[in-house]
Amino acid sequence: MYTINGLGVAIATPFDDALDIDYKAFERLLDFLVGRDFEASAGEYAQSAFADESVRESFQRFWVRESGGVQFVVVLGSTGEGATVESMERRELVRKAVGRKLGIPVVVGTGSNSTKVAVRLTEEAVDLGADAVLVVVPYYNKPTPVGLVAHYRAVAAAAGGKPVIVYNVPGRTGLNLVPSVLKQLWEIENIAAVKESSGI
């Protein structure tokens, strides 16, 4: 099992003009983030995006110099449209990320304001090969501290021993995790980390 540490990137989910997921662009972005096929990927993108040859060459040099080197990727987080993509699309994105054999952990966003849905998404992600899951604090419903702990216990059990990263982003959820709740969550064996985005 991978250890989740170092620099991670929440990967964007690219869409085409028809609002369908661009899976090829997603795979190129994954390769870029781990430093794989820089020049080939940069050249392919530059060829289609820039008509001027000097601009293409500058872009390609920048791409190769600035890319790669992350220690884990997060698929289907907030940036990855985790709350908005369809179930089939979620599964395909996880399959693509895991199937890319990046050599680094793939963390999958599986949070929901429904415990039942969060459990199902977590089970699916783990079954598809996710190395860890990122679970946002349930949004909109504003559960009590007891409800929050119960929610995370259920999700952690569904993760089958894989690390669970708690995601505290009160600006999006309307609920801030307080230290007393975090202390209880930390007692759950596979709660491994907190992504803290409260701004405090």
Protein language model regions, located:
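Active-site beta->alpha loop and helix N-cap motifs at the rims of alpha/beta catalytic domains
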Residues: 1-176
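Catalytic alpha/beta core domains of metabolic enzymes, predominantly
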Residues: 156-162, 169-200
